[in-house]
Amino acid sequence: MHILVVSVNYRTAPVEFREKLTFQATELEQAMTTLQKQKSVLENVIVSTCNRTEIYAVVDQLHTGRYYIKKFLADWFQLEIEEVAPYLTIFEQDGAIDHLFRVTCGLDSMVVGETQILGQIKDSFLEAQQVKATGTIFNELFKQVITLAKRAHSETTIGESAMSVSYAAVELGKKIFGELTDCHVLILGAGKMGELALQNLYGSGARKVTVMNRTLSKAEIMAEKYMGHAKPLSELQCALLEADILISSTGASDYVITKEMMTKVEKMRSGRPLFMVDIAVPRDIDPAIDELEGSFLYDIDDLQGVVEANRAERLKEAEKIQFMIEEEIVLFKTWLSTLGVVPLISALRDKALAIQSETMESLERKIPTLSDRERKVISKHTKSIINQLLKDPILVAKEIAAEEGADEKLALFAKIFDLEMEDVESRAEEVEHKRAWTPSVPSL
């Protein structure tokens, strides 16, 4: 089995391509279910955010897995593989494990050290579990990754000076206007990104804020928290007439604001400029609007320069976290290496318990006057003897599993204890394809 990551992210692809490969939240479960049926894929988790779409997979063959995951992406988004391939980055084995740790800890984010990605990774993992797209390997790996990310943020200061994308959008507005107290700000979208933007706006002194959303009640709830006003999306054109700054993050699949709409609006704004920050992927605002004289449009990729603040300080903390990651990778690989010995240990235990059971039956035939209590006491003590006898051999088997040439040594181990290899291999298949185990996931 191999661990594989297929990634398209802000480093490798511009926003105009990333938006073509963005999974909507409502389709993630179906996407993971479909991917799980692809040849070579044994487990999978799909993560899709404004800055990345990534497929994490356990595959039985690397070459086959790579091909079918690329094909899945192309088919799902109705593109040709040749269109998708140039923008993809592939991580395998140790590189894939390291990448997952780095992403979840915020080290691979546009804003180094941000914590939003941790919640997004956890949510994607839980959805994958719900549709039975994860198994023994990813259940253990993601649990370990989420735990480490929480520890990294609590034991370092990397998150204290990190900006979110929403914060960067507000900072851009402050660079343009200075004080935001007298600015009319329009927020499109009442999701997490929109609320973070509104929270940062309020903290920066903005009080003339309007929130718009397809569901008016959500906009009203969000606006009320920060002394803003809510309006239905049907009044968008009127709201654009009043706004000085627009921050948009709706999650819509099509443009919410078109060039045609803004052309009409500009004619009624009497030459007043409108600064628009589109942090949605797919984008909410038609990029052609930037051609208009009075509209100044920035997308999520344009925020890169803004988020450089305090970067040097955060990179020092990132080095500490990378060291923590390397330690965790060693622990995970040790666990992974012993996974193959589990069926062998199980077979050894079963054989010992079978002997104990036969011994108890023989004893009951020879001493039929034994009471129930006496039987239980004898059974308990004979099982205790078995556990004591097996303790050292099991520890040795686990150590052997982590060594080079483990297969030959474990085969000798099985021969010493007269274990049938066919039974062991059958158990190995059961472990490999196990889907039922669901570990507890650390809370955020």
Curated annotation (Swiss-Prot):
Q: Where is the active site?
A: 50 (nucleophile)
Reply yes or no: does the keyword Oxidoreductase apply.
yes
The organism named in the record is Bacillus cereus (strain ATCC 10987 / NRS 248)
Task: Report which reactions are catalysed by this protein.
Answer: (S)-4-amino-5-oxopentanoate + tRNA(Glu) + NADP(+) = L-glutamyl-tRNA(Glu) + NADPH + H(+)
Enzyme Commission no: 1.2.1.70
What is said about its interaction partners and assembly?
Answer: Homodimer.
Single GO MF annotation: glutamyl-tRNA reductase activity
Record's protein name: Glutamyl-tRNA reductase
Q: Other remarks on record?
A: During catalysis, the active site Cys acts as a nucleophile attacking the alpha-carbonyl group of tRNA-bound glutamate with the formation of a thioester intermediate between enzyme and glutamate, and the concomitant release of tRNA(Glu). The thioester intermediate is finally reduced by direct hydride transfer from NADPH, to form the product GSA.
